[in-house]
Amino acid sequence: MIFIDACFKKETPYTPIWMMRQAGRYLSEYQESRKKAGSFLELCKNSDLATEVTLQPVEILGVDAAILFSDILVVPLEMGLDLEFIPKKGPHFLETITDLKSVDSLKVGAYKRLNYVYDTISQTRQKLSKDKALIGFCGSPWTLATYMIESEGSKSYAKSKKMLYSEPEVLHTLLEKLSAELIEYLSLQIQAGVNAVMIFDSWANALEKEAYLKFSWDYLKKISKELKKRYARIPVILFPKGVGAYLDSIDGEFDVFGVDWGTPLEMAKKILGDKYVLQGNLEPTRLYDKNALEEGVEKILKIMGNKGHIFNLGHGMLPDLPRENAKYLVQLVHNKTKH
């Protein structure tokens, strides 16, 4: 698989490409599948439809990897927190984590209750072309913790940070508990058939450097180290969003570092490029315009060359992006990097 070879810095015939949120609302096929499911959460839980949605971007766009269709919040959901998705607003937990008692009341073994995810993986792997990789994923302990404490996405993360500074032991207990679940969750995804795993630290940028390293990065390192120990041949991709200013402190046993669009790629290459493969980092809104798209691709390929790079966006696909431009992006990257 070209994608897997690229994760390990091996020579590839061209630069592989996939896109974060490549299965999404910009595809009418996705909209139809979601309609059949009835809701976003039911779509995640319906393995037949989730498989359909996982495969759509590979079939329509020609990307080099499929990423499992699911949601990072299924883990806290199966730990006992009721979750709903509010239209035009997003995820919302009906109860929150406020103290040590509420952390202790979380159910352990959530990874044993996520069979609908593993079924989607095995179905997808059976149907996916052998030369295409399947990526599994989870959210980082810190990002999951913020949702569990705030009840939803936040602009200030005030409750999470209040706990971090005034009751750090409570937050560490929660992060430890989540890390243990995530190690087993990703292990079972690998056993079900994924070829690589990715950890999304979507709210990494909520923390100053010292707090980030202690309350997020240390846990990411712990998870990736254990996974590499268990499954050395499975690439681990980490995507901490918005930590461009902290790159000099990034270390650990993983293979690919996801670069968001706000971080200069030249800088990431200079600091991390010798040690890790870089993934990213096209600004997603360039997909609205073909000229802007071409210019962005040219710039990235000039910096990265043919090795040590997986092409991706620096954030997820937006719901109203023209699908023909997404398809054009895949062709553009393949054609420009063939050698």
Swiss-Prot record:
GO biological process, any: protoporphyrinogen IX biosynthetic process from glutamate
Binding-site residues, substrate: 21-25, 71, 147, 202, 315
Site (Transition state stabilizer): 71
Enzyme Commission number(s) of this protein: 4.1.1.37
Gene name of the record: hemE
Primary location recorded for the protein, binned into one broad class: cytoplasm
UniProt entry tagged with the keyword Cytoplasm: yes
Protein's name in the database: Uroporphyrinogen decarboxylase
Annotated HAMAP family: URO_D (MF_00218)
Keywords, in A-Z order: Cytoplasm, Decarboxylase, Lyase, Porphyrin biosynthesis
Biological or metabolic pathway of the protein: Porphyrin-containing compound metabolism; protoporphyrin-IX biosynthesis; coproporphyrinogen-III from 5-aminolevulinate: step 4/4
One of the record's GO molecular function terms: uroporphyrinogen decarboxylase activity
Catalytic activity field: uroporphyrinogen III + 4 H(+) = coproporphyrinogen III + 4 CO2
